[in-house]
Amino acid sequence: MTYRVIVTPAAESDLKTAYRYIRSEAPRAARDWIRRARQSAKSLARHPERCPLAPESASFDLPIRELFVGSGNRGTYRFLFVVFDEEKSVYILHVRHGSMLPLTSGE
């Protein structure tokens, strides 16, 4: 079963911010990172439930899952998303660096 993947405006902004930061340190790595990030987002179209629940999921009404992207000295980013089985959709809510505090209900 295939899901439609929707990147919310907040997540798109998060991606751009991360890209600009990485680009300021390593332009080539930034291009590779954004390509991997977009491929990872697209991968959620197949079996999004393979990803674990995010630690902050218990604080929200909907289960929030996380997909880890990246590693090494650039760090790992978490794609935080919800799955709506009824409409076969995945909404990527935010993209956060692994060192950031957990998502709060105000974000």
Language model region names:
Residues 69-107:
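Enriched for short, Lys/Arg-rich terminal
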Residues 1-66, 71, 107:
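Basic, Lys/Arg-enriched alpha-helical interface segments
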